[in-house]
Amino acid sequence: MARYRCCRSQSRSRCYRQRQTSRRRRRRSCQTQRRAMRCCRRRNRLRRRKH
């Protein structure tokens, strides 16, 4: 199954596709692209608050 991962950089709002990796990284990976996009936006918001 292909999973979508949340993008780490703020400039990119897109999420990239990712193959199944080790069980450790399973938490961050999302099953659908929409979920990944949500995760992405949430992270950006939290980062902005910190600064």
Curated annotation (Swiss-Prot):
Residues that span the membrane, as ranges: none
Return one GO MF term. Answer: DNA binding
Indicate where this protein is primarily found.
nucleus
- GO BP, one annotated term: sperm DNA condensation
What tissue expression does the UniProt record report for this protein?
A: Testis.
Its keywords, alphabetically, are:
Chromosome, Developmental protein, Differentiation, Disulfide bond, DNA condensation, DNA-binding, Nucleosome core, Nucleus, Spermatogenesis
Q: Which InterPro entries match?
A: Protamine_P1
Pfam families documented for this protein: Protamine_P1
Would you name any one GO CC term? nucleus
The protein's location, in the record's own words, is: Nucleus; Chromosome
Q: What job does this protein perform? A: Protamines substitute for histones in the chromatin of sperm during the haploid phase of spermatogenesis. They compact sperm DNA into a highly condensed, stable and inactive complex.
| Subunit description | Cross-linked by interchain disulfide bonds around the DNA-helix.
Family under the similarity heading: Belongs to the protamine P1 family.
Task: Report the protein name in the record.
Answer: Sperm protamine P1
Q: Which species? A: Gorilla gorilla gorilla
Q: Which gene encodes it?
A: PRM1
